[in-house]
Amino acid sequence: MEETEAVQQDIEALEREIQTIKIQIANAHSGASKDEVKIPDAYKQFLSENINFSNLMRKDENTTLSINLSPRKPGTTTGQIQGIDSSIRSNFGVSSGHNEVAGFKSITDFVQWENSVRLIGVSLFPVNYDNIEFMGIRLELFDELSLKYDPPFYVILKPSVKRLGIWELFKHNLPKYINIHQHWQLITKDTDTSDSNIMKFANLCYKDLLKVHSRVQFFRKLEGNYVNDKQYSLLHIDNMGLNVSFRLGADIIKIKVDDGDDEIIDCTFNGEKNISLLGSIYGITNRFQSIIM
């Protein structure tokens, strides 16, 4: 039943997406036909960097992200952007486009393209707020257990009021363990916010997110596994996967993991120190044998 509802939500989101694009095409002031519209320079620029301006559906919320493809020519506000964290969403409205949109031979081709490129996990999208062009960065991680994407993380960039053509960090909802300001300074030096540098910055943040995500997923995927007839059961894991406790049969094991190299640096077995599990977390299942014999 839940799967049927999820599919229905996807269909409805896709229909809204198609309707939005139809309106944008109808409002386009170019001489192109409905099925042949030009790709704006901004799109060409980012496509060359393998970057996309996505407005795709998601299953977890009202997920159609309507964007203004001509951010310097605001249109009629249609509501708040859906799918953005509440700390960010209140700062933005959505404007309908009045200029050319990405040029594909059909609306279906356009939607299919956006669905495919968003799978890479990192995407950019333009946002218009109070006649000012902002840039959004969307970071998405895939949950291998639920076979769904987690709710996205967002970073919003604003144009500098002091330096023409320079972007500045505005708002974000990244976890505290992501050194976003350090990454921004490292890549851009606060002076070079070229398209390629913005993508490098986004990829650096995504890499940090993915590292923690993969570590947590690793421990969660062990749930229910057996070692010599003793079942693994996860009891506790923090949001970074650094402090983990689990049951192996009747035994309670607690470990601490180093964030830098994913090495287990401390281990207790039923409350007593044990060095048998020290080493890479990804070899932990092989080392279980040494503590349960």
UniProtKB/Swiss-Prot annotation:
Residues 107-293 are annotated as: D-RWD. GO terms for biological process: cell division; centromere complex assembly; meiotic cell cycle. GO terms for cellular component: kinetochore; nucleus. It is found in: Nucleus; Chromosome, Centromere, Kinetochore. InterPro entries: CENP-O. Residues 1-31 form a coiled coil. Keywords: Cell cycle, Cell division, Centromere, Chromosome, Coiled coil, Kinetochore, Meiosis, Mitosis, Nucleus. Component of the heterotetrameric kinetochore subcomplex COMA, which consists of AME1, CTF19, MCM21 and OKP1. The COMA subcomplex is part of a larger constitutive centromere-associated network (CCAN) (also known as central kinetochore CTF19 complex in yeast), which is composed of at least AME1, CHL4, CTF3, CTF19, IML3, MCM16, MCM21, MCM22, NKP1, NKP2 and OKP1. COMA binds the centromeric nucleosome-binding protein MIF2, and to the outer kinetochore MIND subcomplex. Component of the kinetochore, a multiprotein complex that assembles on centromeric DNA and attaches chromosomes to spindle microtubules, mediating chromosome segregation and sister chromatid segregation during meiosis and mitosis. Component of the inner kinetochore COMA subcomplex, which connects centromere-associated proteins and the outer kinetochore. COMA interacts with other inner kinetochore proteins to form the inner kinetochore constitutive centromere-associated network (CCAN), which serves as a structural platform for outer kinetochore assembly. The D-RWD region contains a double-RWD domain which is involved in the interaction with other kinetochore proteins. Belongs to the CENP-O/MCM21 family. This is Inner kinetochore subunit MCM21.
